[in-house]
Structures are given as C-alpha cells and as structure tokens.
Amino acid sequence: MNDHHTSASISATAHRELAPQGEPAVSRDLAPTGEGCYCPAAMSESAMVRLRIAVVVAALLFAALLFASPAVAGAPVITAAGDIGHQGEPDAPQRRTARLVLSIEPTAALTLGDNQYPDGELADFMASYDPTWGRFKNITRPVPGNHDYHTAGADGYFDYFGQRAHRSNGGYYSFDLGAWHLVAVNSGPGSISNAQLDWIRDDLLRSDAMCELAYWHHPRWSSGTNHGSDQDMAALWQVLYGQGVDVVLNGHEHNYERFAPLSPSGDREPRTGIREFVVGTGGAGSYPFGDPIPGSQRRITDVFGVLRMTLQNDGYTWAFVRANGRVSDNGHHGCHG
C-alpha cells in the first residue's frame, strides 16, 4: 500500500456504474387462431411492429447490462459518517450504523471525526467504538474531531487507530481509490494550520486523478443550529476549489445535509463548485436545523445512518442510507475532470 507521502493506500479499478433501468412492458396482443392458442401468426400488423420494437429494446438492455456488470462490480464503494461512539448505552445507535456498514460491504469506511464520545479516551474507544465500528477497522480511513481532542493530543484516537491515523504526519494523509484521489484532513483542533494547507495544496498538485474528494470534521457550510458554517474552514475550501476537488465530506453537526456545488463564497457553481455532504449521523444524538442557508438541497435530522458513494471513473453516485436500510436521499454527478 502506497499512500501519498504517508503509509497505506487502497487501490481498486473503478468503472462507470450503469443506472438501474426498468425493462419496457412487452405488449403481446396475440389474437386467437381458433385452435385454442394465442400465436404471433394471428397478430395485427401494428401489434407485430410493437412486439418487434419491444424485442429489440429488450435485447439492447440485456446487452448493456451484460457488458456493464463487471464495471459496476469493480467500482469502489465507500461509506462515511461522523459523530459515532456514543458512550454508556447498552444498545447505542452506533451498533445499528455499524451493522449497516457491514451490510454494504464497502471498499473503505471513512469516519468524519468525533469517533468516540465524550472525550476520545482509549478506554472508551475499546468499550464503545471497538465492538461496533471496530469490526471493520481494517478498511477504516479515519479523521479526528474536536471530541477526540478532548483527550490531550487526541492520544486515545491515535493510539486506537495506530498507523491508520498517521500521527507522525500530523493526522492528515491521502490515498488513491480507483480513479479517485482522497485527502484526509485533520481539523480536530478547530483550525487548519498553514503547514497542513501547504501540504494539501502540494499533494493535490501532484495528483493526476480524474476525481478528487476531501474529508474532515468541521463543515464549511451548514444549516445546523448547534455549530453552523465554520469560517475557519474558508482557507481550506479555497485551496480545494483552486485544485478542482469535486466532493467534501464532513461531520460535527449531528444531522445530514447535502449542498449544491459551491464556490468559496458560497455561490452555486454547477461546473466547478465543490459539493459538500454533512453526515454527522453515526451514533451520537441528533441536532436540529435552522433556516436553510443558500445552496442547501437536502436536510434530514433525528436519524442515524451513513452515506454510501460509488466512485466511478468520471463521477459518483450517492445515497444516504438510514440505519433501517431505507434510502432517504440519492443521486449522481460527474467529476470536473
């Protein structure tokens, strides 16, 4: 495994995913022959034309599905959520979201910070996080949040995740997944250092990936009332926008919110903007929304779940999946290229 300037990486071949399509209804309209059967020979001319068209369409759909199946199977799938380990409950919600991740069988599981409440102590990680989300620790790509830093230096977080947390590199790192380049950012202390910004800019300059994604804890944009939009993330957004990043994933607000692609000033930019998902729904109690801010497209609270993304060669599909398996938001979008 070969992380960019750190340690491990995940590599998979991503292909374009074929969107599900329903087969057209085939109208047979077969006329009785007088011998107790319904046969094509007795069709009207218009019915025969409809049948021929339907057969051709069905054959084309079958061929498309046949040749697309390997592409769908090969596209990397990620899950993402933050605000996870809710301490002290015997049947805490993170048990349900962990089972959901296991059922999805992702290529990689991204955590979006505040992995363990209330203070990110190692003992709490072992008692709460490890029996649930720790079941897929081997595919987890974590970032820390402010609650992880309630323990000095986020020691519990770094000790629990070990090399996967990249302590020696300041807790930030990057890796490739199929056609995508992903950057894990450390916003746990509440701000992004100039050294980290420089590293992120240089890392993205070296990337030749078609599609790019960055993830961290504190959202630049949010309609939530507990924290809301974080101005301290503005410089980071500017760097990511300047390097053509496609998607950002955050936690911190304990709800789900999807934004239109946005510029650094928060204006909609369908062609060059960055789409942000806030997914603070991993297990900690929910937070309410205020009035939607510009660019907000979907808001869901009082729910636990994860974001599922399929990383295609030139785009992505997304679905917010509740802990009960119900999909509450989904769509697809192309990469900037």
Where in this protein do the model-derived segments appear?
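N-terminal amphipathic/hydrophobic targeting modules at extreme N-termini
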Residues: E17-A31
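N-terminal active-site segment of His-dependent metallophosphoesterases
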Residues: V72-F125, A195, D202, S222-S223
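Intrinsic-disorder-associated, low-complexity terminal segments enriched in Asp/Asn/His/Tyr and depleted
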Residues: D3-H5, H15, D29, Y38
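Bacterial N-terminal signal peptides
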Residues: A54-A68
